From Swiss-Prot:
Belongs to the universal ribosomal protein uS12 family. It comes from the Bacteria. GO terms for cellular component: small ribosomal subunit. This is Small ribosomal subunit protein uS12. Residues 1-31 are annotated as: Disordered.
């Protein structure tokens, strides 16, 4: 433990926090082009085929992003909007693709949590 005198001379070093989504470079979202769209399996104990895409962002970064929701229309060369946010059971996936924006359509027939999946309000009968 330092003495008061040592603290007066030196001071405490502030710990800098490392970004959890460095490819965003302090932007809320980034545009990118899909270079590969594929499925991958999660870590134990989960089991599924999770839909992910490798995206080249406008700032040159190449990231793996998760495609949320049921069904999607993404292909290679699709232009997408990428936001931060990791997927806990997929190692290396630290970004999400925004549904209902640019080339990615919203989830069809979605009734709840629509804003998260880019779904329009259903017509009232």
């Amino acid at each position: 433990m330092p003495t008061i005198n040592q603290l007066v001379r030196q001071g405490r070093e502030v710990e800098t926090t490392k970004s959890k989504s460095p490819a965003m470079q302090n932007s809320p979202q980034r545009r990118g082009v899909c270079t590969r769209v594929y499925t991958t399996t999660p870590k134990k104990p989960n089991s599924a085929l999770r839909k992910v895409a490798k995206v080249r962002l406008t700032n040159g970064f190449e990231v793996i992003s998760y495609i949320g929701g049921e069904g999607h229309n993404l292909q290679e060369h699709s232009v997408v909007l990428v936001r931060g946010g990791r997927v806990k059971d997929l190692p290396g996936v630290r970004y999400h693709i925004v549904r209902g924006s640019l080339d990615l359509q919203g989830v069809k027939d979605r009734k709840q949590a629509r804003s998260k999946y880019g779904a329009k309000k259903p017509k009232a009968k």
